[in-house]
């Protein structure tokens, strides 16, 4: 199995803001450059791990978009993006999102009661975004079949499972130690 993701994480830059060390990576930030080979590797691995007998894939704006696009093209499953702005469409579901570094609203459109869905996102750290997505999908009456994040950094998996009952799958677990990304699994 290819390990492009893991190798790219080991060499990505780290920036410190306050006391927090951010890793800057193409999948989580879209910079410095998103290589097709990396996106292809990730989407291939994702497809092997998720239920593909679903109606829709759901992600939050913004960095889940390249991932769901690649998975959608490969599987012919359409996707829905929870946006950060309101569109005022009929049936739109607003949900409050709180992460370790921001607060705001997300807006869900395009989900019908009974839709079988998979949630995909780029990074889980505090779990706040995933909890918001899951709550919105439950309000819409969706049948959540799988939840997967590419990169796991922090305790978000446990928080999501405690708050929602859903287990979050991930491709890689990391932590930042001494200014470098360490691969834990």
From Swiss-Prot:
Group of enzyme by EC: transferase
Cellular compartments per GO CC: cytoplasm
Gene Ontology terms: biological process: IMP salvage; purine ribonucleoside salvage
Entry-linked Pfam families: Pribosyltran
Swiss-Prot/TrEMBL keywords: Cytoplasm, Glycosyltransferase, Purine salvage, Transferase
Documented EC number(s): 2.4.2.8
Subunit structure: Homodimer.
The protein, known as: Hypoxanthine/guanine phosphoribosyltransferase
Organism, scientific name: Methanococcus maripaludis (strain C5 / ATCC BAA-1333)
Lineage start: Archaea, Methanobacteriati, Methanobacteriota, Methanomada group, Methanococci
């Amino acid at each position: 199995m290819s390990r492009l993701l893991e190798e790219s994480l080991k060499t990505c830059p780290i920036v410190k803001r306050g006391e927090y060390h951010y890793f800057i990576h193409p999948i989580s930030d879209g910079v410095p450059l998103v290589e097709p080979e990396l996106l292809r590797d990730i989407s291939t691995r994702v497809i092997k791990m998720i239920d593909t007998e679903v109606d829709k894939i759901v992600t939050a704006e913004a960095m889940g978009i390249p991932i769901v696009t690649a998975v959608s093209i490969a599987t012919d499953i359409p996707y829905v993006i929870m946006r950060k702005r309101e569109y005022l469409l009929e049936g739109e579901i607003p949900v409050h999102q709180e992460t370790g570094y921001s607060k705001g609203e997300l807006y869900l459109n395009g989900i019908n009661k009974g839709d079988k869905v998979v949630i995909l996102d780029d990074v889980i750290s505090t779990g706040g975004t995933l909890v918001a997505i899951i709550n919105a999908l439950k309000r819409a009456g969706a049948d959540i079949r799988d939840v997967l994040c590419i990169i796991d950094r922090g305790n978000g998996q446990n928080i999501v499972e405690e708050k929602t009952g859903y287990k979050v799958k991930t491709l890689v677990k990391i932590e930042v130690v001494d200014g470098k990304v360490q691969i834990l699994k």
